[in-house]
Amino acid sequence: LSLHDALPIYTRVTKKLLNLLALKYELDFSQKEFKSFHSHNEKEILKNLTKDTFTKNVVYCSDAGMPCISDPGASLVDWCIQNEVPYDVIPGANAILTAFAMSGFSSTEFTFFGFLDHKGTSRASKLEEVLNSSRVGILYESPHRLLKLLEELNKKEPDRTIFLVKEISKFYQKTYKNSAKNLYEELKSIEIKGEWVVVVEPKEKFGFNLELDDILPLDIAPKIKARRFLKNTYTNLVLFRI
C-alpha cells in the first residue's frame, strides 16, 4: 500500500511512527500531506471531502489501538460507504482482545462497555450493567478516573475479581489481578499513569434462573414471558406490550 495522504488522529505521533519506518525501510514521507482527523473536527473534514480526495491512497490511522474502537473513524467509514469510495480495514493492535486474553478469566464471552460517563446516573446505571452481566465486562479508563472506578467497584462488589492492565504492548505495561477491595487499597497509594483496560469478572449464576435476555427471544405469548420472568425474579415487574 503506497501512501499519498494521511489522516491521523494527531499528526505528531503518526509522523514519529512514519519517520521510524522511513529510516528502517529507506522510505520518504516528507512530501506527504498530513491532516488531523478527530472528534473535534471530523464534521468539518467530512463536509469538505469529495471523491477526488481519494483518487490516490489515503490512510487513516490512530495514535495507538484501532480506529473506530473507542476512537474516531466510524463517520469516515460511513462517508466512504455512502459515497461508494472503496476502502479496506487493516487490523491493528486492539486492547480489548489483548486484555481479555491476558485476564485469565475462563469465560468465552465478553461485553465491551468502552469508557463510562464521567458522572451522573448514566455512569451509575452502566456500572450496574457491568456488574450484573453474566459475561466478562471490559472497560477503558483514563489514569485520572481509574481510582474513582476502583472505589465504586469496592463499594458495590468488594470481593469481585478485577484484572487491570495499563499501556498494553508498551514499555511500561503492567498488570494487576485481585479483588476490587485489594486493588483499590493498592493503587490509591501510588501515582497512576497511562491508559488502562479494566476487565471485570462476570456475575456468578446460581441454579437455573433465567434472565430477561434469555426470556425475551422465546417464541411464546407475551403473558407467559412475563410470568416466567416474575417467577425467576419475584422482585422485578416487567410490562410487555400485548
Residue ranges and their predicted role:
Residues 4-7:
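Short, small-residue-biased leader/transition segments that mark boundaries at the very start
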Residues 12-14, 95, 145, 204:
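Alpha-helix capping/helix-boundary segments
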Residues 18-27:
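Helix-loop-beta element that forms the nucleotide-linked donor phosphate-binding surface
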Residues 19-20, 38-51:
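Short, structured surface patches at the beginning of a domain
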Residues 32-33, 56-57, 136, 140-242:
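A contiguous loop/helix-start segment that scaffolds small-molecule binding in enzyme catalytic cores
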Residues 34-43, 115-119:
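Conserved helicase motor
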Residues 45-90, 94:
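Glycine/small-residue-rich loop that forms an oxyanion/phosphate-binding "nest" at active or ligand-binding sites
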Residues 75-133:
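Class I SAM-dependent methyltransferase SAM-binding "motif I" and its flanking Rossmann-like core
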